[in-house]
Regions:
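Catalytic Tyr-X3-Lys loop
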Residues: 97, 105, 113-132, 146, ...
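Amphipathic alpha-helical dimer-interface segment in Rossmann-like NAD(P)H-dependent oxidoreductases
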Residues: 123-143, 152-154, 188-189, 193, ...
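Short, small/polar-rich loop/turn modules that mediate ligand/substrate recognition or access, typified
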Residues: 192, 197, 267-269
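Short C-terminal tail/terminal secondary-structure segment
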Residues: 256-257, 268-288
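Conserved mid-core segment of classical short-chain dehydrogenase/reductases
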Residues: 48-56, 104-119, 157-165, 169, ...
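Canonical Rossmann dinucleotide-binding motif of NAD(H)/NADP(H)-dependent dehydrogenases/reductases
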Residues: 2-40
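Catalytic loop of short-chain dehydrogenase/reductase
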Residues: 105-109, 146-193, 204-207
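A conserved structural motif in NAD(P)-dependent oxidoreductases
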Residues: 225-230, 240-252
Length: 288
């Protein structure tokens, strides 16, 4: 029997990357999936986002695991449209047990207009809140909410550093992830009497389309005009404690599975870092 057998999971940003990986693993462990993605680009985010055919492929992979998939094209910035999409998915499957607020962008390009800050915050912070708050009415005791943060949330200088190297979008990304960490803490306290768990996962560099994009390469290698993947990967390990360039989406999915499963039934309000020791490089020990 799978670790989330008989459960229904809602995942935003599910068309590719970490979201697709989460959908596939949760399906392999017995969950039906409500997969949501915007499936179109956002102007200030200079790498291409997923397309409808990517979302279809996620559904195919879920069904290949023997589970049901309900797909919705929706923008997490639009709470009303998102709520309607979630309602349709829950109407089809009859319940909702797991919420994974995964959708995110990282418009790290120097010289972008201030709108890039707004877009990053709208997706990475308000989008998380919109998904979760549109889902709460469907949840019950034992349900699990998981928000995707970032190791940037723990960097004291993340906003300044990202703002310098990645423009206003990089600053917005770092700011949003910091507030997500605080939000998860406070929401976990709020929902504890209902026995609904709320946790955050904070990845480091992850091997997805977001990382492997010209704007991100440039953010890591501002000394080069048009850095290649190979040139960027030389400095990727500086973020981690381990001498590796990035973790894999599946590494994050295993953490999602744990937090979604009954193995974590008393785990709430946690900031789970899947960062290959990145936090240890930037934060001195200050006691438990």
């Amino acid at each position: 029997v799978g670790r989330v057998a008989g459960k229904v999971a809602l995942i935003s940003g599910a068309a590719r990357g970490q979201g697709r990986s989460h959908a596939r693993l949760l399906a392999a462990e017995g969950a039906d999936i409500i997969a949501v993605d915007i499936c179109e680009d956002i102007e200030t985010n200079e790498y291409p986002l997923a397309r409808p055919e990517d979302l279809d492929e996620t559904a195919r992979l879920v069904e290949k695991e023997g589970q049901r998939a309900h797909t919705e094209i929706a923008d997490v910035r639009d709470r009303a449209a998102l709520a309607a999409a979630i309602d349709r998915g829950v109407a089809e499957f009859g319940q909702l047990d797991i919420v994974v607020a995964n959708a995110g962008i990282c418009p790290m390009t120097a010289g972008l207009p201030p709108q890039a800050f707004v877009d990053a915050v709208d997706v990475d912070l308000l989008g998380v809140m919109n998904l979760i708050h549109a889902s709460i009415k469907h949840l019950h005791a034992g349900a699990s909410i998981i928000a995707t943060g970032s190791v940037a949330a723990f960097m004291a200088t993340a906003v300044n550093t990202a703002g310098m190297d990645g423009g206003p979008g990089g600053a917005g990304y770092a700011f949003a992830k910091q507030v997500v960490a605080h939000y998860v803490n406070d929401l976990a306290r709020t929902l504890a009497p209902e026995q609904i768990r709320v946790n955050a996962i904070h990845p480091t560099n992850c091997n997805t389309d977001m990382l492997h994009s010209p704007p991100m390469y440039k953010a890591f290698r501002p000394d080069l005009q048009n850095p290649t993947r190979e040139e960027a990967e030389v400095v990727f390990p500086m973020i981690q404690g381990f001498p590796i360039p990035y973790v894999e989406p599946e590494d994050i999915s295993e953490a999602v599975l744990f937090l979604a499963s009954d193995a974590a039934r008393y785990v709430t309000g946690q900031q789970l870092r899947v960062d290959a020791g990145g936090f240890l490089k930037i934060k001195p020990w200050s006691g438990p």
